């Protein structure tokens, strides 16, 4: 199904089927769900499409999208696709400076936002010289669209290789980059998701990462808007999420490991199960096998999965909690990395020698079990970044007219063809001795220590000497200096049990690790390294 025509076709097939359920809370224990059918969603998209077209927004115009998740986001995105304008999606939690830099790089012609973004308009006008029009979706404008009966009668260009959307990366180990997707790539992405997970038209999805809600209308699924602030996911109230799962009979849910930790803690404390869930996806950062098991125990009729991918390439691989616990967990505990499963159908994965240099030819693959750089190729992998030639040269390899994407990750393939993740390339530590330390492999050793909540491998420099160091976030931070010293000595002794970590000599404690805003789970190891380098 073409993403452009999806709403129209789904509305014709399932006109009264709920497309969106929006929570409206009245007090702590009283929530009502406003329901919008696919037929109503189609009408909203048609009216807004016609209005935007009448405002001069046309084929190929880049449009900066600044609306909250839910009804407004879905209607706006599909309206822009309908007139073949290019929605530009930037993470609202990355901070004003990063946001403005992303907007400036994109060079959008139009901004469409909610009333709350008015405070940013002066900054945007100064930073983004290409902006010619700013449209605020006020209540009065929405009312006007409802009552005036706009009719959408737009010419369809139907060029599948035209730009369809720009989605920015989180920039957790660099700077945010705008991945450009064509209609052909978006269509292929939807087909890959459907083939891998067999979503059914009567299913209900609760996406804790807003961008994933955009696939639901195309997959004929109902979207339940979560009660949370997407720019501050750590403020999530797990009680509200569990209530939504039960009230709306949610069958599908996506969330980061940190958010799932909140949900699992809540469910276990209240002895609550989640029987309606068929699938729970944990992604956005490496997932501890014990968390996978905890979530699986909450789903008597469902499966827990951890997919692997990136903003530029999703999905790449996937593994179930059951396979992790039965086949790969023991190797992870021994420092073997995290298994992220078999590549999805029609996805090619290759492990190549590690290098920081741009590549103009496709390197030969490394042998099985050899750690190297992960590169991937699929019909839905984004091939370019918007207005960023240096990033394109660094992240893309063109071979025989086919574009491979360098994931920026390190890992290896095992004898069965499964992919194992060993960490980000930018975060591995190369010691003066030449030995390479991988974050995912080393941290697994320390994360098994009873006193440790999580750990981070960082590069520590003293003069011309580079060595690995481990930062520990304890479950309970000792208050007294004496107790901190005892804990660090215990951690140092713990490191001696494994060949991977026995020669690490620097250890630090940190109360709260800095993490990314999008998933609230990816550790900012480079930021930690800068912090301890200054001490």
Annotate each predicted stretch with a short phrase.
Residues 364-369, 373-432:
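Conserved ATP-binding/catalytic segment of the ANL
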Residues 221, 252-254, 265-335, 348:
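Gly/Ser/Thr-rich phosphate-binding loop
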Residues 35-39, 164-191, 222:
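Conserved AMP-binding A3 loop
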Residues 456-461, 469-470, 492-535:
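Conserved C-terminal "lid"/linker of ANL adenylate-forming enzymes
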Residues 82-145, 474-480, 493:
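Structural core segment of the AMP-binding/adenylate-forming
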Residues 15-18, 149-171, 175, 198-204:
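Conserved pre-ATP/AMP-binding loop-to-beta segment of ANL
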Residues 86, 187-204, 209-252, 266:
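Conserved AMP-binding/adenylation subdomain of ANL enzymes
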Residues 20-70, 74-78, 95-100, 157, ...:
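Conserved AMP-binding/adenylate-forming core of the ANL superfamily
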């Amino acid at each position: 199904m073409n993403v452009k025509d999806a709403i129209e076709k789904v509305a014709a097939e399932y006109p009264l089927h709920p497309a969106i359920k929006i929570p409206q809370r009245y007090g702590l224990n009283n929530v009502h769900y406003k329901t919008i059918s696919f037929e109503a969603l189609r009408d909203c998209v048609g009216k807004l499409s016609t209005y935007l077209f009448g405002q001069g927004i046309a084929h190929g115009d880049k449009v900066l999208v600044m609306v909250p998740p839910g009804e407004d986001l879905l209607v706006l995105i599909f309206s822009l696709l309908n007139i073949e304008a290019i929605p530009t999606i930037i993470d609202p939690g990355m901070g004003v400076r990063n946001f403005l830099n992303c907007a400036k790089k994109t060079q959008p012609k139009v901004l469409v936002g909610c009333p709350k973004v008015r405070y940013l308009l002066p900054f945007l006008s100064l930073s983004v010289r290409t902006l010619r029009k700013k449209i605020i979706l006020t209540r009065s404008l929405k009312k006007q669209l409802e009552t005036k009966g706009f009719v959408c009668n737009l010419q369809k260009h139907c060029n599948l290789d035209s730009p369809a959307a720009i989605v920015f990366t989180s920039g957790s180990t660099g700077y945010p980059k705008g991945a450009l997707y064509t209609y052909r790539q978006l269509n292929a992405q939807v087909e890959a998701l459907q083939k891998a997970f067999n979503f059914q038209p009567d299913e209900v999805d609760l996406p804790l990462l807003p961008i994933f809600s955009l696939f639901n209308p195309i997959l004929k699924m109902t979207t339940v808007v979560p009660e949370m602030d997407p720019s501050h996911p750590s403020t999530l109230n797990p009680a509200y999420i569990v209530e939504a799962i039960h009230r709306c009979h949610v069958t599908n849910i996506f969330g980061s490991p940190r958010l799932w930790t909140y949900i699992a803690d809540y469910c276990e404390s209240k002895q609550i199960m989640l029987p309606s869930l068929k699938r729970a996806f944990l992604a956005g950062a490496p997932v501890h096998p014990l968390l996978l098991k905890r979530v699986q125990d909450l789903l008597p009729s469902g499966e827990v999965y951890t997919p692997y991918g990136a903003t530029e390439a999703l999905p790449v691989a996937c593994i179930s909690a059951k396979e992790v616990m039965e086949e790969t967990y023991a190797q992870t505990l021994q420092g073997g990395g995290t298994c992220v499963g078999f590549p999805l159908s029609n996805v090619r994965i290759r492990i190549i020698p590690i290098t920081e240099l741009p590549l103009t030819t496709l390197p030969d693959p490394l042998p099985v079990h050899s750690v190297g750089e992960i590169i991937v190729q699929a019909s839905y992998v984004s091939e370019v970044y918007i207005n960023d030639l240096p990033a394109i040269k660094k992240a893309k390899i063109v071979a025989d007219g086919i574009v491979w994407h360098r994931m920026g990750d390190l890992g290896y393939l095992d004898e069965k063809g499964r992919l194992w993740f060993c960490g980000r390339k930018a975060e591995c530590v190369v010691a003066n001795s030449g030995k390479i330390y991988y974050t995912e492999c080393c941290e697994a050793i320390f994360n098994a220590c009873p006193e440790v909540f999580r750990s981070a491998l960082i590069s520590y420099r003293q003069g011309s000497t580079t060595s690995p160091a481990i930062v520990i976030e304890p479950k309970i931070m000792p208050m007294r200096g004496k107790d901190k010293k005892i804990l660090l000595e215990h951690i140092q002794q713990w490191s001696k049990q494994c060949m991977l970590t026995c020669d690490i000599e620097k250890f630090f404690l940190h109360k709260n690790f800095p993490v990314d805003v999008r998933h609230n789970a990816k550790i900012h190891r480079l930021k930690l390294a800068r912090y301890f380098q200054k001490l």
